[in-house]
């Protein structure tokens, strides 16, 4: 095990090496939340502290992550199993894997959050942790901002560090021994006037195969807690968006600057319109008395010289706004058809298909990477369940493919060292369900693929063994009628 000093020095080195990546993450986060002034100070006037155009970065990230965040098919069976005993054993493990997913609330929005992190920051993290109240492993989606994974030459995770900020009162509630460090000398309580309870404290958690250590970097590396890793391995599964330079690059690192330019152009246009409405009034010299209001009478010998001072708008302003809109769509790889805006010139099947082509590849690539991360996380969950609660008899309940199930299992007996699980989005990943099903029916109709293959590639959650058994029973009952 490393000493606290060695851990602190290592985390500091990882943080220094990821300085540019951290800045990109902060910029994307601030743009999505509308804090433009923190990215480009002074760019927003006091009267309009927020952008006056739709936040295309945020809406695109939400739209893409909601499409990408559909749950894959999770199975522990394969088509080579022939005996009923092996099929029953694998079917039980399939229900266990789905129970882990349901208990982790992945179908209830956590998977969409994971995909959002993958798109926005180029890094998404599953942390497999034990829930000692329910006695089950949980796949927790962790915020990758401030996360520093260390990988070897082959892409395997060696250590994982994360730094975040938390209020002092929350830390003291979790770790009472920290009150001596965080509470100032002479302080008598938690009064707001003292202010220490609301201060945000920097916390670091370091994990590797040997140890789990938490400390306060800004308070002389004060140790919070440290323990040996009971699993003897990292139970962290990460999904890294492919990049050309091995950096964590999100999908919007470059697009935010186009959006900021578009927002600035819209603000200048709004300012020009306001100035045009409130333009000064030019009058001839012989006008002695100004009268304002409806049906006012102005006495002058030169009424044609009474006018508002106009502001000449550049002719290319509208064209530049359209160019920025087009560049922003290219940068985010999101077609206009996703928001319902389709140019009348391309309202054909081929036109819509061409617009969706780039979007489909984003979904397909993302689901392949995320599927592998979920597969590793479920394997860690099987191993954790067997190691921490080996002989405990458990009853699990859940819903798969719309059908509720209830199963009893003992980890040491029903897992038995077999942690393999298959996570598949299907060969038609990225397509809408209707097109995917039609393509598979065509392949099945020409006997190019087996029925088992088609069932495993369906864009929905399904227990292949249970479904096939149910189909066989229904066919047998129909034959007897």
Model-found features: residue ranges?
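N-terminal hydrophobic or amphipathic segments with adjacent small-residue motifs
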Residues: 63, 116, 149, 189, ...
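Structured, contiguous alpha/beta core segments that scaffold functional sites
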Residues: 3, 9, 19-22, 115-123, ...
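C-terminal anchoring/interaction modules
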Residues: 1-16, 283-481
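Intrinsically disordered, low-complexity regions of eukaryotic proteins
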Residues: 29-32, 37-39, 60, 65, ...
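Long, contiguous amphipathic alpha-helices that act as assembly "spine/axial" helices in icosahedral shell
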Residues: 30, 56-61, 69-79, 84-130, ...
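Intrinsically disordered, low-complexity, compositionally biased regions/tails
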Residues: 38, 46, 73, 150, ...
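Extended, helix-rich architectural segments
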Residues: 1-178, 182, 322
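A broad, low-specificity signal for short, low-complexity segments enriched in glycine/proline
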Residues: 84-90, 220, 289, 413-416
């Amino acid at each position: 095990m490393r000493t606290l000093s060695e851990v602190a020095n290592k985390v500091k080195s990882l943080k220094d090496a990821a300085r540019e990546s951290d800045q990109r993450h902060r910029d994307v986060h601030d743009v999505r939340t509308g804090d433009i002034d923190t990215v480009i100070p002074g760019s927003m006037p006091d009267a309009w502290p927020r952008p006056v155009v739709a936040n295309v970065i945020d809406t695109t990230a939400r739209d893409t992550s909601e499409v990408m965040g559909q749950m894959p098919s999770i199975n522990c069976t394969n088509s080579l199993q022939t005996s009923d005993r092996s099929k029953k054993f694998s079917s039980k493990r399939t229900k266990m894997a789905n129970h882990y997913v349901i208990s982790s609330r992945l179908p209830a929005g956590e998977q969409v959050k994971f995909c959002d992190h993958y798109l926005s920051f180029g890094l998404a993290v599953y942390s497999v942790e034990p829930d000692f109240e329910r006695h089950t492993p949980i796949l927790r989606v962790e915020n990758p901002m401030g996360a520093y994974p260390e990988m070897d030459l082959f892409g395997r995770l060696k250590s994982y560090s994360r730094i975040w900020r938390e209020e002092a009162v929350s830390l003291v509630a979790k770790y009472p021994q920290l009150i001596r460090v965080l509470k100032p000398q002479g302080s008598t309580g938690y009064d707001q006037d003292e202010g220490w309870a609301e201060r945000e404290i920097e916390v670091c958690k370091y994990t590797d195969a040997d140890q789990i250590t938490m400390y306060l970097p800004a308070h002389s590396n004060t140790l919070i807690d440290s323990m040996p890793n009971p699993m003897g391995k990292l139970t962290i599964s990460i999904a890294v968006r492919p990049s050309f330079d091995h950096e964590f690059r999100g999908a919007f690192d470059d697009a935010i600057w186009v959006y900021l330019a578009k927002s600035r152009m819209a603000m200048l246009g709004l300012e020009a319109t306001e100035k045009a409405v409130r333009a000064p009034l030019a009058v001839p010299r012989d006008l002695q008395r100004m009268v304002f209001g409806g049906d006012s009478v102005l006495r002058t010998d030169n009424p044609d010289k009474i006018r508002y001072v106009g502001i000449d708008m550049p002719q290319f302003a509208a064209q530049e706004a359209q160019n920025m809109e087009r560049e922003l769509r290219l940068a985010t790889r999101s077609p206009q058809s996703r928001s319902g805006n389709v140019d009348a010139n391309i309202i054909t099947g081929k036109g819509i298909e061409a617009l969706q082509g780039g979007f489909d590849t984003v979904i397909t690539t993302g689901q392949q990477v995320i599927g592998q991360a979920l597969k590793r996380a479920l394997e860690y969950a099987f191993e954790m369940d067997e190691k921490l609660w080996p002989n405990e008899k458990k009853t699990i309940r859940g819903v798969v493919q719309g059908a509720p199930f209830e199963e009893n299992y003992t980890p040491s007996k029903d897992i038995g060292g077999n942690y393999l699980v298959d996570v598949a989005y299907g060969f038609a990943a990225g397509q809408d369900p209707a097109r995917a099903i039609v393509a598979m029916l065509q392949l099945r109709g020409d006997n190019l693929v087996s029925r088992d293959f088609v069932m495993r590639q369906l864009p929905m959650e399904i227990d292949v063994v249970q479904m096939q058994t149910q189909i066989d029973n229904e066919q047998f009952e129909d034959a007897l009628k």
